[in-house]
């Protein structure tokens, strides 16, 4: 299940206990990141700027 975000960069996110799913406004593709803990998913959902959170805590750290 994808959760819509109020973000100029990210349209929706999801998490299944191990994988984080991210869909950006610029693409219909849903990107999958493996080994992402709940704390990162929750931080992304609750962030004032999900795009900034994504770049600081997810991009380049999870594949």
Place the predicted regions along the sequence by residue:
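Acidic/histidine-enriched, beta-strand-rich ligand/metal-binding domains
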Residues: 1-63
